[in-house]
Design a protein with these regions (language model features):
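N-terminal hydrophobic or amphipathic helices/low-complexity stretches enriched
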Residues: 1-15
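N-terminal capping segment at the start of a domain
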Residues: 12-29
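N-terminal glycine-rich anion-binding loops that anchor highly charged ligand groups
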Residues: 14, 33, 37
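Cofactor-binding active-site loop characterized by glycine-rich and histidine/acidic residues
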Residues: 7, 26, 36-167
Length: 168
């Protein structure tokens, strides 16, 4: 257990270091507070809990992560690098013209980005929809959603929560 904790702590440290490095490419213009605050959770999910290796990105056995609070995309990008889904040099593309690694995540399943971010309250409904599909198609993978405090008052979040409870 101690080794698993230390592994996740090391991942989180590298993710934070990488986010600071990424600031060189965007002139420091990033959503630092949110990105730094979710780093530990992402380090545990991607480093210890989720099944999301590069070999199984296309299959129903892999787990999926939806970052509903899209302004924290830089934390997601560093988690994808830590998992090996993306290479470290992709971080240099953060907020560059023509890059898929913008300030807000843009859906690109081939790169481990399951959902576009930025519109408040859309991540949980998308996650519930994915979970329903997974249940119907007998996927073994799990769906994880990270929401932000700014979106919990959105009606779509409450509708999704009620639907998730109803459909289990």
């Amino acid at each position: 257990m101690k080794e698993r904790i230390e592994k996740c702590e090391d991942i989180a440290k590298r993710m934070r270091r990488d986010m600071v490095e990424m600031s060189k490419y965007c002139g420091g213009d990033a959503h630092w507070g949110g990105a730094m605050s979710c780093t530990d959770a992402l380090a545990v999910l991607y480093g210890d809990i989720m099944n999301c290796t590069t070999e199984d990105l296309e299959y129903g056995a892999r787990d999926r992560f939806i970052l509903s609070k899209g302004h924290n995309a830089m934390a997601l990008y560093t988690a994808l690098v830590e998992t090996g889904i993306e290479s470290p040099d992709t971080l240099e593309q953060f907020q560059q013209d023509g890059s898929i690694y913008g300030e807000l995540a843009i859906m690109n399943e081939a790169h481990g980005i399951e959902c576009s971010g930025g519109s408040l309250g859309l991540g949980l409904p998308m996650g519930v929809g994915m979970a329903l599909k997974a249940k119907r198609e007998h996927w073994t993978g799990k769906i994880y959603v990270m929401t932000g405090d700014g979106e919990v008052d959105e009606g779509s979040v409450w509708e999704a929560a009620m639907a998730a409870a109803q459909f289990q």
